[in-house]
């Protein structure tokens, strides 16, 4: 029987043809952050969520020591600072630094992935007081604070990366306490991506007048800053406890604590009352962590070499030791044999395996006389 082709399917009058479902090709998506491949988040529970609260105090430099002053009011500004372009450290506000170590995660590492803590949201607020009587006592004048303001905070899995800048070509920063950027002394701003001074805030000696957060780095970090300028700007400071800050990026990933630490950096400048700099009394943080799976960047071979195959102690022993390989339980013979040992010496040397390596030069001899 001959095979006949089936007639084409035609739509009935008054009905539209059945639409075929659109096929969407799903491509594998690999998300990397902080140098690791990020996987799914662990569902929230009492064991997989962690919350911590802390207060971070303001920092003002110290002109006579190496420890910071946790003041909210600086020393009086000097009128000669404009000519000397070297301000006093007691009048310089520096970045405050703190760190949080979440608890250890049981069964954290497997062959394929590992569990880490992830900061996904937080609440923060600055503590302020109306400066009225304090202004009378410190300056002899009446009135609240005025002038420039700065509000800044940063949270990250590593210390904050900063750029070293100079407001003028002659500004060098305080001569004591603070860490000042090394510039060429001619250009006040960023002059090249490779020569601009860069650093990480690893202590509380970085002035807010010389260091600014680096937007080209800080991949595993979130920071926010707000500046209100003006010599006589009336400050407006609002504070509340009804704001939550999400810290997730476009892929839904927060701050990864890859080193088991979370670094917190902040600075709050309220203004100037006559000749004294006023800062916030403190900044409050409430941090919310959850667990996240990331691909294990360490192979079993690497762990074996770095952990198990590492000598426990370093010794200082004899040199010129030659490794000898034995084949078929036939041991090596000395290169020269004195006297007759059953058979001629040449016969014994001819039976040496090819894999035996003898100590040719500088043999180690134990002579007792």
Curated annotation (Swiss-Prot):
Q: Which SUPFAM superfamilies match?
A: Group I dsDNA viruses
- Keywords, sorted A to Z: Capsid protein, Disulfide bond, Host nucleus, Host-virus interaction, Late protein, T=7 icosahedral capsid protein, Viral attachment to host cell, Viral penetration into host cytoplasm, Virion, Virus endocytosis by host, Virus entry into host cell
Cellular component GO terms, alphabetical:
host cell nucleus; T=7 icosahedral viral capsid
UniProt cross-references to Pfam families, sorted A to Z: Polyoma_coat
Record's keyword annotation contains Disulfide bond:
yes
In its UniProt record, which GO terms are filed under biological process?
endocytosis involved in viral entry into host cell; virion attachment to host cell
Matching InterPro entries: Capsid_VP1_Polyomavir, dsDNA_vir_gr_I_capsid, Polyomavir_VP1_sf
Localization in the cell? Virion; Host nucleus
Which range is the signal sequence, renumbered to this chain? Answer: none
Q: Where is this region: Disordered?
A: 1-28
Q: Which Gene3D superfamilies match?
A: Capsid protein VP1,Polyomavirus (2.60.175.10)
GO molecular function term, any single one: structural molecule activity
- Record field: compositional bias (Polar residues): 17-28
- What does the record list as coiled-coil region(s)? none
* Subunit description: Homomultimer. The virus capsid is composed of 72 icosahedral units, each one composed of five disulfide-linked copies of VP1. Interacts with minor capsid proteins VP2 and VP3.
Similarity comment: family membership? Belongs to the polyomaviruses coat protein VP1 family.
Name of this chain's protein: Major capsid protein VP1
Tell me what organism the protein belongs to.
Answer: WU polyomavirus
């Amino acid at each position: 029987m001959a095979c006949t082709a089936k007639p084409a399917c035609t739509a009935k009058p008054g009905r539209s043809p059945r639409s075929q479902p659109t096929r969407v090709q799903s491509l594998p998506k690999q998300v990397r952050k902080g140098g690791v491949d990020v996987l799914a988040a662990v569902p929230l529970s009492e064991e997989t969520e962690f919350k911590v609260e802390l207060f971070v105090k303001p920092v003002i430099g110290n002109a006579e020591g190496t420890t910071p002053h946790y003041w909210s009011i600086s020393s009086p500004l000097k009128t000669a600072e404009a000519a000397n372009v070297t301000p006093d450290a007691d009048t310089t506000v520096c970045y405050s630094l703190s760190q949080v170590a979440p608890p250890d995660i049981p069964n954290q590492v497997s062959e394929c992935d590992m569990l880490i803590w992830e900061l996904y949201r937080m609440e923060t607020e600055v503590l302020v007081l109306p400066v009225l009587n304090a202004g009378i006592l410190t300056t002899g004048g009446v009135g609240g604070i005025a002038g420039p303001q700065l509000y800044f905070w940063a949270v990250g899995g590593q210390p904050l990366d900063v750029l070293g800048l100079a407001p003028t070509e002659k500004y060098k920063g305080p001569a004591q306490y603070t860490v000042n950027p090394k510039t060429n002394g001619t250009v006040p701003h960023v002059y090249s991506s490779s020569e601009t001074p860069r650093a990480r805030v690893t202590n509380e000696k970085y002035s807010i007048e010389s260091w600014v957060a680096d937007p080209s780095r800080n991949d595993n970090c979130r920071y926010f800053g707000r500046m209100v300028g003006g010599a006589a700007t009336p400050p407006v400071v609002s504070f509340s406890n009804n704001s939550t800050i999400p810290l997730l990026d476009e892929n839904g990933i927060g701050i990864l604590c890859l080193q088991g630490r979370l670094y917190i950096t902040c600075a709050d400048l309220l203004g100037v009352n006559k000749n004294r700099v006023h800062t916030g009394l403190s900044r409050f943080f409430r941090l919310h962590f959850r667990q996240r799976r990331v691909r294990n960047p360490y192979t079993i071979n690497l762990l074996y070499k770095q952990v198990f195959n590492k000598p426990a102690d370093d010794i200082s022993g004899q040199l010129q030791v030659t490794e000898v390989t034995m084949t078929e339980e036939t041991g090596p013979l000395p290169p020269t044999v004195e006297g007759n040992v059953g058979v001629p010496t040449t016969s014994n040397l001819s039976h040496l395996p090819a894999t035996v390596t003898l100590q040719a030069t500088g043999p180690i001899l134990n002579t007792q006389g």
